[in-house]
Amino acid sequence: MSTGTVVQVIGAVVDVEFPQDAVPQVYDALEIKSEDLVLEVQQQLGGGVVRTIAMGSSDGLRRGLEVVNSGSPISVPVGEKTLGRIMNVLGQPVDEAGEIGEEERYVIHREAPSYEDQSNTTELLETGIKVIDLVCPFAKGGKVGLFGGAGVGKTVNMMELINNIAKAHSGLSVFAGVGERTREGNDFYYEMEDSGVLDKVAMVYGQMNEPPGNRLRVALTGLTMAEKFRDEGKDVLFFVDNIYRYTLAGTEVSALLGRMPSAVGYQPTLAEEMGVLQERITSTKTGSITSVQAVYVPADDLTDPSPATTFAHLDATVVLSRNIASMGIYPAVDPLDSTSRQLDPLVVGQEHYDVANGVQTVLQRYKELKDIIAILGMDELSDEDKTTVSRARKIEKYLSQPFFVAEVFTGSPGKYVSLKDTIRGFKGILEGEYDNLPEQAFYMVGSIDEVVEKANKK
């Protein structure tokens, strides 16, 4: 355990000098005992000086303070004791419910599983959300991204997925709140408590008000806890909200360390940093990690380097659209932009594939006809096109669905729709079984039976 002294403090960056023969390694955790602060080594500057990033507030730090090298990277509690608890980036409890009392700790910087240890699966994970189950089905043990700009419903969608999957799921869940609002973390805790599944969830939070070093590492802390459960042979759900804040924290740290920025001001190591996190989120022959990640899209630009780098790592992408949200259709998932590797007849079956394809074809044709309708009106369309437009509008409305987590805001009870009912409903619309029903009957309902019931009431 070597000791050094603080020689320079610039915001969250702290330079520490050690004896030449005891210089800490990169990623080692250093502790300033008097300030109860942990630093992580980022660079060795030479002459025994290392440059570190503070994991907490650096207010009040001064030159000459004693710093102790722990000799290893940041380690966090893992295992059963973390369930039902809220922790920070260092694995310290922040829920005022006493010590974690862990039996084991893991370091947060770990190697990804080797290629031969990884397993692939084609088992589907039903979410109960029509548009997702139909157009971009999730795989058990896969990686899913929820892409969307500000205010189109990423967090609400994620909460609904947690509600539908985590509550019905017999395994364990880990939630990593990366650079998001404290209020959302609070809401999530009480949501889990009310539904009685708190003892199956471990929560790790590093909110918006935390320093960049904290936000950069909190995703790794959550992932380390999920990996432990996976290595014990369990099926784990890993939720991250929000991956963009992880990238942004990396950008801040990179700038603080004086690195030259690359495209759009991002860090030059963007792809590598994303890879370090994403390569570890994988299923092995022992257990599985199914991850759902919210990804903020700056200025609704999907070609921005941050979301574009994330796309490459995912099995399914759920793209939320501002245009669809402005039509009052929630969840505002864009069925033409969202994709899934699982949407293959060999995985989902021929019927599901054909119905999903049919829905996308009709919606795409409607999109093409919109300009003609705007200029010439509906009367100039052929009868076939008029039918297509009518069915497309019904499909658009039917893609909406009341959420359980939004009941308090909307006043309408949430609906869970099984995959079988979803396929049956859309197949019926495509085949013209419901051509005689009014368009409005398809809006904000669960299964197709409710549409018929709603239409008959009118």
Swiss-Prot record:
UniProt entry tagged with the keyword ATP-binding: yes
Record-linked SMART domains: AAA (SM00382)
Chain sites annotated for binding ATP: G148, G149, A150, G151, V152, G153, K154, T155
InterPro entries with a match to the protein in the record: AAA+_ATPase, ATP-synt_VA_C, ATP_synth_F1_bsu, ATPase_a/bsu_AS, ATPase_alpha/beta_chains, ATPase_F1/V1/A1_a/bsu_N, ATPase_F1/V1/A1_a/bsu_N_sf, ATPase_F1/V1/A1_a/bsu_nucl-bd
Keywords: ATP synthesis, ATP-binding, Cell inner membrane, Cell membrane, CF(1), Hydrogen ion transport, Ion transport, Membrane, Nucleotide-binding, Translocase, Transport
GO function terms (MF aspect): ATP binding; ATP hydrolysis activity; proton-transporting ATP synthase activity, rotational mechanism
GO CC, one annotated term: proton-transporting ATP synthase complex
Enzyme Commission no: 7.1.2.2
Keyword Cell inner membrane among record annotations: yes
Highest taxon, organism lineage: Bacteria
Listed Pfam families: ATP-synt_ab, ATP-synt_ab_N, ATP-synt_VA_C
Subcellular location: Cell inner membrane
Bilayer topology: Peripheral membrane protein
Quaternary structure and partners: F-type ATPases have 2 components, CF(1) - the catalytic core - and CF(0) - the membrane proton channel. CF(1) has five subunits: alpha(3), beta(3), gamma(1), delta(1), epsilon(1). CF(0) has three main subunits: a(1), b(2) and c(9-12). The alpha and beta chains form an alternating ring which encloses part of the gamma chain. CF(1) is attached to CF(0) by a central stalk formed by the gamma and epsilon chains, while a peripheral stalk is formed by the delta and b chains.
Reported function: Produces ATP from ADP in the presence of a proton gradient across the membrane. The catalytic sites are hosted primarily by the beta subunits.
NCBIfam families: atpD
Protein name: ATP synthase subunit beta
Gene name of the encoded protein: atpD
